[in-house]
A protein has these predicted regions:
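C-terminal segments
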Residues: 2-8, 14-26, 72, 329-396
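Flexible, glycine/charged-enriched surface loops at secondary-structure junctions
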Residues: 36-41, 153-159, 234-242, 267-275, ...
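Active-site cofactor/substrate anionic-group-binding motifs, chiefly glycine-
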Residues: 59-120, 337, 347-350, 361-362, ...
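Rossmann-like NAD(P) dinucleotide-binding subdomain of oxidoreductase/dehydrogenase enzymes
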Residues: 79-222, 253
Length: 396
């Protein structure tokens, strides 16, 4: 038996928003007991609906990613710890869904479709709130998603859209503790500055990545060139966010002209500090405030830094805690860089290629508490303890 489907369910008024949250709560209860085959079937059905109805290529690409998530291991029911009490009872800590997750977003809706894979795979109901200028496109895409869900055993209310621009509705959404279990605000700095201090619902802080690539004295020039170009030409939203290169002075005179040629061919605008500009006079000059700024793709900053200590200090001052890289043949320097740099991801002598569904995730948490890094289904779960005296009666 398939779930009932109501097209174009729009939550625009305050009362409609509260009703949508109640429906999400009910859907979350059904998702809690849905098995992996049912959740995977829902992902595949949504992918089919997107491919058959979507006109643009971006939603079809999102459909392919949904199929990828359907082929990943089930995050639910995994035993994390097992203990035995003195009375002989056995205790197991299992992964379970979080419940209702609200995603607030400013990006085009097809970007947020990429989140549906891990969210539904982890058994969560999803409330989407789009920016005003994306309402029409979001309504169309969510309608397609719900149509796909209606052919499965997963309720179509597992995915709903909130279109209300009323401040009272937004405030209710971010303070509906107990009804909404988690917020993921994919919004600009202005709205983020409002949401984070006012929200009583737990949230995952998502910051745009500002990563650094440190080229140590023993860096492989070809690998350095490849990684710089990759990070500057990768598709938008892929999470590869290196826009500052730090170069050891021993290799600056040889490496910077080589990088300049490759970057010019790729039409990438480069600015350098005084030391870098002394080697490459045609480069623009970096202002002091530029180092901590998130720059658009196709813009690169270069600094000549006197060694590992200076590079780590620069990263601590200007990084966002997203992704940091080092290229070096010195194992001690590699180990020290990994230990000292505070970031969700640290890479050594490797291209940051997002070749798994999780590392292609749109959402990358840079907060101190877990989850940190790319958000896959496992990171979008919580846990429960189940205790029984002599045999396992859980369905996990």
């Amino acid at each position: 038996m398939t779930a009932a489907w109501t097209p174009r369910v729009q939550a625009r008024t305050f009362d409609e928003v509260t009703a949508a949250i109640r429906r999400s709560r009910a859907a979350a209860r059904e998702l809690r007991v849905a098995d992996c085959a049912e959740r995977d079937g829902a992902l595949l059905a949504v992918a089919d609906a997107l491919e058959s109805r979507a006109i643009e290529s971006a939603p079809r690409a999102s459909a392919a990613e949904l199929r990828d998530w359907a082929g990943t291991p089930d995050p639910l029911g995994q035993t994390l710890r097992e203990e035995q009490r003195r009375d002989g009872a056995r205790m197991r800590q299992l992964r379970v869904p979080i419940g209702v997750i609200a995603v607030l977003f400013d990006d085009p809706p097809h970007h947020v479709l990429r989140l549906l894979g891990p969210l539904l795979k982890a058994g969560n109901a999803v409330l989407l709130r789009a920016a005003r200028h994306h309402h029409s496109a979001a309504e169309t895409l969510v309608d397609i998603v719900r149509e796909g869900l209606a052919t499965t055993r997963i309720p179509s209310d597992a995915v709903q859209l909130i279109s209300s621009e009323q401040r009272s509705s937004l405030r209710y959404l971010i303070t509906a503790r107990g009804d909404v279990d988690l917020l993921i605000p994919l919004v600009g700095p202005g709205l983020r500055a409002t949401i984070i201090p006012e929200a009583t619902v737990p949230l995952i802080e998502v910051a745009p990545g500002k990563g650094h690539l440190y080229l140590d004295a023993t860096a492989d020039p070809q690998l350095a060139e490849d990684i710089v170009l990759l990070c500057q030409t990768q598709p938008t939203g892929s999470g590869l966010t290196i826009d500052t290169v730090l170069v050891h002075p021993d290799i600056a005179a040889e490496l910077l002209p080589r990088l300049d040629g490759a970057l010019r061919r790729a039409h990438i605008h480069v600015r350098g500090d005084k030391a870098a500009s002394a080697v490459m006079p045609d480069w623009g000059q970096v202002e002091d405030g530029d180092w901590a700024t998130i720059h658009q793709q196709g813009q690169l900053l270069v600094a000549v830094t006197p060694g590992l200590d200076a590079a780590v200090t620069h990263i601590e001052r200007n990084g966002s805690g997203h992704t940091e890289l080092i290229i070096t043949e010195d194992r001690r320097h590699a180990r020290e860089f990994c230990n000292r740099v505070d970031a969700a991801t640290v890479l050594v002598n490797t291209r940051p290629i997002a070749d798994t569904p999780q590392h292609r995730s749109l959402v990358y948490s840079t907060q101190r508490l877990a989850p940190r890094g790319p958000l896959g289904p496992t990171e979008l779960t919580t846990t429960k303890w189940i205790t029984n005296p002599d045999r396992d009666i859980s369905h996990g």
